Amino acid sequence: MKVFHILWIITLGAGLWACSSASVFVQTDRVEVNSTISPDDTLQAFIAPYKKELASNMDRVIGFATDDILRDRPEGALGNFVIDETENYLKEDGWLEGKHYISIMNYGGLRAPISKGDITVGDIYRLMPFDNTVVLAKLPANELDTIIAYLKNSGGEPIGGFQIDGENFGLNKGVTLKDTLFVITTDYLANGGDNMNFFKRSYEITDTGIFLREALIKRVEALDTLRPLLDNRIKW
């Protein structure tokens, strides 16, 4: 009985301790980071080889541009390059076999032009600094009308697989409007980014796991020479 009494007291004490709140004292100091702070020599020495390796990779020449490749609206050579070479990469990788597809990216996602001359890995990173992946969205074919309305409202985005001329539109050879249509885009846009809400009505969305930036790097390496292309994809 005495042992039971002692155990009961220990259990009660543990319960009261668990229910009580503990105070923790935290002290912080505000450290302003500005140009007066000297680099840490040890840290600098540690990161130096990684920095050198990164710089070496970013400076690696992968192709040549015959002229500046710029973004523009309603159509720009930079957007056409991104669209066309994304499609070409997916074709080579077997993703588009037997599919009727179009493509749409976003003007705002093209962060830097490709300047005339040597093209480096760093140039493609500046163009595409985000880790966006390439996605195939399966949409009802009648959503093409919604996409065109979106393009009219935005003033134009990079597209492929169809053309717009005022109130009229046409599909590229080999593309037909059946019950469904595959749309090549990015994971960001497929999730409704830039208010592309028509993707929310997708039957299915397949993320290829291919980083858009890496696909473009490989395509530039394969092409070697880039020439700006404008082919009247959008005319208002």
Model regions: which residues?
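Feature captures C-terminal
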Residues: 21-32, 80-236
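Generic structural signal for well-ordered, non-membrane alpha-helical segments
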Residues: 43, 47, 75, 79-83, ...
